[in-house]
Amino acid sequence: GTSGKLFSQSLDEAVWAIDAARAFLVASVEMTLQERLQIEKGFLRPCADLLLSSRDKGNWQVWHNGGIIALGVALKNDSIINAALNKPDLGYYDMQKKNVYNDGWWNEGSVVYHFYPLRAILLSAEAVRCRHINLYDEKVINMFLSPVNMLYSDLMFPSQNDGWYGTTLLEQAGLYEIVALRTGNQKIIDVL
């Protein structure tokens, strides 16, 4: 048997699982049934089980949930997706409630630590679209708008808390493009 574990920490498992699940969905149309089942049973499901048992209270859990969601979509398993969204204290919705202020700022207090979980949130929102779940709510839109209010004229952000200088909005343009496409929010479009 296999454990679905490839890395030394659950954060790396989750980040990698998101890309692996997406790649599986693309490649699976060219696979035989036996090949698909081997990957599902030998990696995808064990990795989902591993991430479902991982617990964190901050940005790691957001990535865990993103990995679980991506794996649930790849496995076409709504109960896995539901756990990632609704698990008490750990699910997507509780993480948003606990960690995102009303103005859209992530509670770790730096731009760097704001965009890190925001990328996982965006990947989660994209993954569940195929299950007719819309995570592009006001809180997510505010997460994209709030950093814009503190930009320097050169599109750089100030260094805050344990973040670092040199972080720029240009690095995040791809995320903003997706949110603009999905929401049609004029303020997001204006940022671009």
Language-model-detected regions and their locations in the chain:
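C-terminal, helix-dominated tail/subdomain
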Residues: 132-192
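Aromatic-lined, polymer-binding surfaces characteristic
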Residues: 1-151
